[in-house]
């Protein structure tokens, strides 16, 4: 599975117990979002405030995502439903 497929799988399988908000990091910018919709190769992110150009929605290709920051105060164990596990 390549990186783009991993990001797509993460967004497709985002659990209801974890708020659909965060900050997507691309090589060009950091994009805060409060919700999203997915497609085969793209994700549309919804901002709570417009950017400097007035845009509230941003469409990003999965292969352009470098990282995802999550502001959630949930304990790490809650993220196991996203496929994460403690090291052995």
For the regions a language model picked out, list residue spans one by one:
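Phosphoinositide-dependent membrane-docking surfaces
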Residues: 59-69
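N-terminal recruitment modules of adaptor/scaffold proteins
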Residues: 1-55
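Short acidic, Gly/Pro-enriched loop/turn segments at secondary-structure junctions
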Residues: 52, 69-84
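Intrinsic disorder/low-complexity detector
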Residues: 1-6, 79-88
């Amino acid at each position: 599975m390549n990186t783009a497929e991993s990001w797509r799988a993460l967004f497709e399988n985002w659990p209801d117990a974890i708020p659909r908000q965060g900050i997507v990091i691309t090589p060009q910018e950091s994009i805060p979002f409060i919700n999203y919709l997915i497609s085969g190769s793209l994700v549309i992110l919804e901002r709570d405030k417009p950017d400097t150009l007035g845009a509230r929605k941003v469409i990003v290709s999965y292969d352009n995502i470098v990282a995802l920051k999550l502001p959630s105060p949930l304990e790490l164990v809650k993220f196991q439903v996203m496929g994460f596990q403690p090291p052995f």
